[in-house]
Amino acid sequence: NGRRRQRQMCIRDRYKRQHNFTAPSSYYSAKIVATITGHGFNQDRANCAEFCDHEHHYYLNGYHTYEWHPIVSDNQGCEKEVDRGVVANQYGSWPFGRAGWCAGQDVKQWVYDITDWVDNNTTNNLIYRGLYNGQEYVPEDTNGGSRKIEANVWLVWYNQN
């Protein structure tokens, strides 16, 4: 589409919750681009990861936005997505809504324009928080199931429209 982009940062390390950056000398726009999915099964107290509505919050210079997965609470959430690439008729829990993905479907990236949030004259501090019920979620592996939330977050600079 003619746009060139440069990746500035990636929050993939499970402990990296903030990123300090300065804006490039010339850019057209800046966006947060995130690919976030929940995986795992079995129950701990929250049964969170694959089947819970975790939220992902971003803060920068007094601004705030968040991403969430509303179909997770719908028992037919993924079944309703068959026309958009979900692989139907698998055994098990394929029809249930999930956190950020459905079986066979490409994971949709979440994109949010933060161009107006960036201060071009100083160091900026982008803060990320992954929450469940308003708090950081720490799974307890009591019954196996390897619950986890995969979060890949980038700050992307666009050089042209």
Please place each PLM-identified region on the residue numbering.
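Single conserved hydrophobic/aromatic residue that forms the stacking wall/gate
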Residues: 1-11
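Surface-exposed coil/turn segments at beta-strand junctions on protein surfaces, enriched
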Residues: 2, 25, 117-121
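Beta-strand acidic-aromatic groove motif in beta-rich domains, primarily in extracellular
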Residues: 43-45
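Beta-strand-rich ligand-recognition modules
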Residues: 38, 48-160
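Extended extracellular/luminal ectodomain segments enriched in beta-structured repeat modules
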Residues: 23-33
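Extracellular structured ligand-interaction cores
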Residues: 18, 29, 53-55
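Residue-level recognition of alpha-helix boundary/capping or hinge positions
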Residues: 15-16, 33, 123-124, 160-161
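Short beta-strands within extracellular/lumenal beta-sheet-rich domains
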Residues: 12-22, 109-112
